[in-house]
């Protein structure tokens, strides 16, 4: 005698996209450990039950359960490797040029006062730079201050991009931060109308990745 103990609970859930539109959560993740599509069988065994003398009945017990479909937030697709690799190459060149172009204190030469950089200090032999250590520390402090502000803005941009374009199984996707901005009456919000106009204008215009994915 076979019995299946399973229950499936599915609902029509919707999510609000970046532009305020309702999008059905259509990403399904089915956990299947056996040939059954909607059920997972844990074990099955034969149970021998004796009744009286010589009266034996074999029962096959099947224990199974079902994992419902997991609905996740629909998020924009990530940039492919065709865009990632050129950006990494440009990053290396930008980092190298920015490193060798850090300005340091002035040094008097035969042609006048020349603004030295790390590259010029590598190429020009130095005689004595110990007398200018105080000016060097001042310029280094200014450089570090500017670098901290620019790097902080870059990290903030990466954090925002990770929230919108990150993995569907990340911690921020479980918090559902995007829908929290549209609670209440989003259609009456001015920013909602602005984003809707921008989206209608930039659809198939502002995205360059579509040319690489085709």
Swiss-Prot record:
The chain crosses the membrane at residues 84-104, 152-172. Keywords: Chloroplast, Membrane, NAD, NADP, Plastid, Plastoquinone, Quinone, Thylakoid, Translocase, Transmembrane, Transmembrane helix, Transport. It catalyses: a plastoquinone + NADH + (n+1) H(+)(in) = a plastoquinol + NAD(+) + n H(+)(out); a plastoquinone + NADPH + (n+1) H(+)(in) = a plastoquinol + NADP(+) + n H(+)(out). It is found in: Plastid, Chloroplast thylakoid membrane. Signal peptide: none annotated. Its main location: plastid. One of its GO terms (cellular component) is chloroplast thylakoid membrane. The keyword Iron-sulfur does not apply. GO terms for biological process: ATP synthesis coupled electron transport; electron transport coupled proton transport. One of its GO terms (molecular function) is quinone binding. InterPro entries: NADH_UbQ_OxRdtase_chlpt_su5_C, NU5C-like. NDH is composed of at least 16 different subunits, 5 of which are encoded in the nucleus. Belongs to the complex I subunit 5 family. NDH shuttles electrons from NAD(P)H:plastoquinone, via FMN and iron-sulfur (Fe-S) centers, to quinones in the photosynthetic chain and possibly in a chloroplast respiratory chain. The immediate electron acceptor for the enzyme in this species is believed to be plastoquinone. Couples the redox reaction to proton translocation, and thus conserves the redox energy in a proton gradient. This is NAD(P)H-quinone oxidoreductase subunit 5, chloroplastic. It comes from Brachypodium pinnatum.
């Amino acid at each position: 005698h076979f019995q299946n103990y399973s229950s499936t609970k599915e609902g029509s859930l919707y999510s609000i996209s970046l532009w305020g539109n309702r999008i059905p959560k259509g990403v399904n993740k089915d956990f299947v450990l056996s040939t059954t599509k909607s059920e997972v069988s844990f074990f099955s065994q034969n149970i021998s039950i004796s009744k009286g003398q010589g009266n034996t009945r074999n029962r096959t017990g099947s224990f199974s359960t079902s994992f419902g479909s997991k609905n996740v937030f629909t998020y924009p697709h990530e940039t492919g490797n065709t865009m990632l690799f050129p950006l990494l190459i440009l990053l290396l060149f930008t980092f190298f040029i920015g490193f060798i172009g850090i300005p340091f204190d002035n040094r008097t030469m035969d042609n006048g006062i020349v603004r030295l950089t790390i590259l010029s200090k590598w190429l020009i032999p130095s005689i004595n730079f110990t007398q200018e250590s105080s000016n060097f520390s001042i310029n280094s402090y200014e450089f570090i201050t500017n670098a901290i502000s620019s790097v902080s803005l870059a990290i903030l941009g990466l954090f925002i991009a990770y929230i919108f374009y990150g993995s569907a199984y990340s911690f921020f996707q479980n918090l559902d931060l995007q829908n929290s901005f549209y609670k209440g009456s989003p259609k009456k919000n001015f920013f909602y109308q602005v984003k809707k106009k921008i989206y209608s204008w930039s659809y198939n215009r502002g995205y360059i990745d579509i040319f690489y994915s085709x």
